[in-house]
Amino acid sequence: MTHAVTLIVNGRRHQLEVTARTALCDALRDDLGLTGTNLGCEHGVCGTCTVLVDGESVRSCLVLAAECDGAEVRTVEGLAADDGTWTPLQRAFHEEHALQCGFCTPGFLMLLTGALERGEPIEDPGHLDRLLASNLCRCTGYVGIRRAAARAAQETRGGEGA
């Protein structure tokens, strides 16, 4: 049995037919072709599938697509401007060498984008530690990710002095 759902993904309205068991990550990847949302553990542990649903960071492997009917969903593909201009966070990830293999990067970008947009104090080391503990990276050791987060917070909140 399928259910009709409407998702507003990266500003575009999509009508989908999904089963009751279709995870949001599968709807994004398989039905909409948005493969930037990676699947790692599929148990909500690693954070690679993090997207924003109505502004909140969620593990798309744990959320059913049907639960998101009418919701605004933002994926990593929806971060850059239409002309390809990067966000301050994307630029900081590049400049601070905050990625290596890149598999976890979309999840970190979405996690940190949500935190920045909600005004969370990610420049506070303790808060950033708690936030980053929710996503896993096996390559970077988190140093570049921490620098990128602080740089993006400074640039977004304090002007271009980053």
What residues fall within each predicted segment?
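Signature of N-terminal electron-transfer/Fe-S-associated modules in redox systems
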Residues: 1-162
